[in-house]
Amino acid sequence: MKGLELSRAFWEDAVRPAIRETCPVLLPRLAAGLCGGGSDCLGYDDELSHDHGYAAGCMLFLAPEDAETHGFLLSALYDRLPREFLGVKTEHRSRQGNGRYGVKTTGQFLLEQTGLFHTPETWREWMAIPSYALAAACAGEIFHDGSGSMTGIRETLRTGMPEDVRVKKIAGHAVLMAQSGQYNVSRCRRHGEEAAARLACCEFVNHTLAMLFLLNERHMPFYKWAFRAAKELPKLSELIPTLEALLREPDEDTIERVSAAVIEELRAQGLTDGGWDFLEPHAYAVMRRIRNPEIAALHIMEV
């Protein structure tokens, strides 16, 4: 059984009935789910994934003010739940967020995932949070949300990035694609540095993946799952087999084809109107679309 399915069943068959019986007043005030890092939250877990971190459990989220009055009671209830569910051991060492499962405040969850106690409020905060952290915070599923607060938090993280921040990151990855792939792969080879050329190609692939997620207005997950998630993107997912081939054997013509496809999408989104084949001038054209003068003043390579 996949982790999300197991967690949902644990909530529906063990946790929610216990709360209804013991403290039903909490149901409208809490959220329950499984979200954050891990292949299970992305739906990518399999039998091999069960060799670590596989347990029956769920997360219970309270607002900070509710945690002060109800957190201990809810944690005690959670710790009294069965030690095994559907033949899978449960994790109980989770009082007040000490562990993956159990009771957490919404602020604790945000701090664990993004480094902030709140959703990002400024462009600087959005720039500082890595894509994989935002992806993890949005991954998984909320099974119940009495107040709607966790749903709102995750929706803000999913869709709330300011457009100027997205555009700035696109510009940065565009110039880094140009530098690593269109310029340095061939240059390293002319120097006889094949290992350096392959490393440059890996950089190109990594920045291209980041670009694809940004062009789709999605957050790129941790590198281990980036390719699999990229295959599900609505736009440019057809490039993924080509990027996989580049990792096996760097090829300059293939790099140019990938770059051309990205340039075409940049034009389609109104981010550039230039006719260049090289990505670098397009990156500067993208920078000129930024309206916030502070963001526009950042170094072009900053992502």
Where are the regions that the model predicts?
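Conserved nucleotidyltransferase catalytic core and NTase-mimicking acidic/glycine-rich helix/loop elements
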Residues: 133-296
